[in-house]
Amino acid sequence: MTNISQNFANSLDILVPFTRDYAKEMHASEIARSLNLPQRTLARKLEALQKSNLVNYKRVGKNKTFFFDLTLLSSFSLLEMVECYKEILFLSKHLQVGLLLNELAVGHSLVLFGSYAKQRAKEGSDIDLVIFGRKSTKLQEIISRYPFEVNVHYVPLSLFEKRLKTGWPLAKEIASDHVLFGEKGKVIKSLINYYKK
């Protein structure tokens, strides 16, 4: 395995906090606290990613803040991998909900938000979901086959982008706490454009 692929495999978990705000600059200590990891271990992983030009940094006093350079194609690709990693983690923890989401994701972009995305869901928690596209009877039939309470919002991606720009609270919540399913590329590009400002 090459050095760069080892960096990917061992570091996807430490990049998850960056998905709350793609443009955020974070100290290693801040990420370590949020993930309950040793700061030195995390700093070494971030340094390795930085040396591979996968994340960038700025010096702030004696410390470094790490961030994604959203103008680079590699940042888009890495964010897509991190979003896939989040999806896989979710599916491994919530098997029954995962079956529903896998069915709905065929040919669609989905965003899970709310208590499940924040990892605070309890037994009986409802599923908050955005499906980018039009409401269809096929999707409604899929949802009705499952014993979950599902709150679905059908929204064109262009309207979601517009609501992000105008500061609509639900759109901002979705941008910061989400798990993406299905066709992620367009949603990630929309979030990158929003955070680039």
Predicted stretch roles:
Residues 112-113, 127-133:
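Short, hydrophobic beta-strand segments that form beta-sheet elements in well-ordered domains
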